[in-house]
Amino acid sequence: MKIRASVRKICDKCRLIRRRRRIMIVCSNPKHKQRQG
């Protein structure tokens, strides 16, 4: 999980979701997991 100030989709399978007021990116590729910090 990468904590970033700005999150963006890296590939086509990345999905942007909101969880507990945080914007997160989930993907089938674990390297693409991101959270806005």
Swiss-Prot record:
Pfam families found in the cross-reference section: Ribosomal_L36
Alphabetic keyword roster: Chloroplast, Plastid, Ribonucleoprotein, Ribosomal protein
GO (cellular component) term, any one: ribonucleoprotein complex
MF-aspect GO terms: structural constituent of ribosome
Classification via InterPro entries: Ribosomal_bL36, Ribosomal_bL36_sp
Subcellular location: Plastid, Chloroplast
Tagged with keyword Plastid: yes
One GO-annotated biological process of the protein: translation
Family: Belongs to the bacterial ribosomal protein bL36 family.
Protein name per UniProt: Large ribosomal subunit protein bL36c
Natural source organism: Huperzia lucidula (Shining clubmoss)
